[in-house]
């Protein structure tokens, strides 16, 4: 009888914790309009530009259109996003999305672990004056024709287009 009660308690706690995790992840869901800045392609700084990132059900998406001699549009699709109680974001995704080149083919975006003193993915979301604010730093690379490593990085700060969820 004690084992059944203990098992029931464990199941109840698992359900509660799973529910809390889902609430933490979805309370920040929304479209974040802001500025992509510190955009670097092959180490060369590109101009800042307006863009939107969408966070929905643990997936972060956004697109950086072709800039200058970039081979195409960078399409971020970062899955497995979790948000801790302090707003720190983590991902379990093995890659960051793709780059669509010349409207013909896609190349995978990999996390770049070689950038000095920076993690390949940094994300933070918080409420500021009743509005959700998203801050990102993404260090990535792609392989052109599977041979040439092309590094890139982008930072982003934006505000949610919907009011922050009440705590």
What residue ranges belong to the model's regions?
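Edge beta-strand at a domain terminus
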Residues: 23-31, 75-88, 131-167
